[in-house]
Amino acid sequence: SRNVKEYGNRVYNRYPARSIFLVPRAILSHQADRPLNVLDPFMGSGTTAVETVLSGNVPYGLEMDPFARMVAEVSSSIFTGEELIAMRETFNTICANWIDFESEHIPQLTGIERWFKDGDLDLLLKLKSAILSLSPQRFLPFFLVTFADAIKPVSLMERQSLKPYISTKYAKITKDVLSSFMYSFEAHM
């Protein structure tokens, strides 16, 4: 699944349950006589919603996981050219100013600090504060998903594993906060 983009997949986040886009694409390609309302009762990260939008149909989905709902919302959103320019400007503003923000919005998770090198959690929280303060409401879900995707490369958690652990055998070389966020932004644009 490392090269799924080559085959048409739109990977907006490494959400563990994303499905293969070819199934909804094949089904929707045989329903071309009129626009459809498509219900996905287990929406996950929105693969069916994306294919539904791309085929000119209207997606509806149900998902209990709030993060998965946000990923699905972002992945199936259509932005105008002007909005894409505004998103880039917002991104540039965040990148230029994030370091001056306070480390707020600390997750109430026991032992969260152990997953990061010294100082990295503080830097991530500064970036999150900047995103929450500087992003227009229309773009906020996009920037939050981009931020979420940037966390794992900064953390000590193994990137290729869905199981959360820190390898004691092979020390992970982490990315810095800003370059990880920039990489995620470019990958999602």
Residue map of PLM features:
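A short hydrophobic/small-residue beta-strand
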Residues: 38, 49, 59-61
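Short secondary-structure boundary micro-motifs
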Residues: 44-45, 98
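Conserved SAM-binding loop of SAM-dependent methyltransferases across substrates and taxa
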Residues: 45-57
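Nucleic-acid modification enzymes, centered on SAM-dependent nucleic-acid methyltransferases
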Residues: 1-33, 55, 60-189
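Conserved class I S-adenosyl-L-methionine
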Residues: 35-44
